[in-house]
Amino acid sequence: MDALGGLDLTVGAGEFVAVVGANGSGKSTLARLLGGLERPAGASFAVACGCDLLSEEGRMAARREVGVLFQNPENQLVAECVEDDVAFGLENLGWAPKAIRARVDEMLARFWLADLSRREPHLLSGGQKQRTALAGVLAVPRRVLVLDEPTAMLDPAGRAEVLDAVHGLRAAGLAVVYVTQEMDEVVGADRVVALEAGSAVYAGGVAGLFGDVALVQRLGLGLPAAGELALELATAGRPLTPLPLSLDELVAALGGER
């Protein structure tokens, strides 16, 4: 049985698309396919670079164009200090030392790591480790970034660090595919794709997904925290329409009742 089938996903430059679904729905398989880390079992499967992932050449091309960040940053940290880890991919590609230094400094600044440049990875917090891994992935210029539940092992502060960093990449024109089971992380997406048994059962706006209560329940997704609070208020006789999905929307909706 194929893990994915009949899935058509288009993500534009600067666009943030969230991918959600229950365990086993195909989210991680999609992330690995997009990054050229697995070979599709069936028909042609192409990514932003136009490469066909059925061929080894196509998968190698995808790995150059598509950066992938996974749950556990320690699996992607390979050097003895932060700046050496960020430089690792560039050194393997044969970049000139001056170009490497400039690019590493750029990445350290972008991901708020300059003060930690000589720090050993095992001394970093979870959020700092994930930002270091992200800087290393993107030190090599990419067109697409795929993140597979990158905050799953982080505390709330670490999650906020990583989300702020990822959302900041949109302004740079990077296409972002963000796999998550945290519904609060979906709220800031441009679009959301919901998977079930390897197929997309919803693709569209965030409000449209969470407005379909039956589908959300069937997929076992839950709602963002603000939406859950709004449902409790509705049960208590204070319905809010449309359903607020963020804290700001909830506060605005409650203020509008006065």
Residue ranges of predicted features:
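ABC ATPase NBD Q-loop/coupling interface
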Residues: 44-61
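ABC ATPase C-loop
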Residues: 137-138
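The feature captures the beta-strand-to-loop junction immediately N-terminal to the Walker
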Residues: 20-22
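Conserved ABC ATPase "signature" region
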Residues: 98-116
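Helix-to-loop junction immediately C-terminal to a conserved catalytic motif
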Residues: 35
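Conserved ABC ATPase signature
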Residues: 120-124, 128
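Catalytic Walker B motif of ABC-type/P-loop ATPase nucleotide-binding domains
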Residues: 145-148
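Conserved ABC ATPase "signature" C-loop
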Residues: 198-199
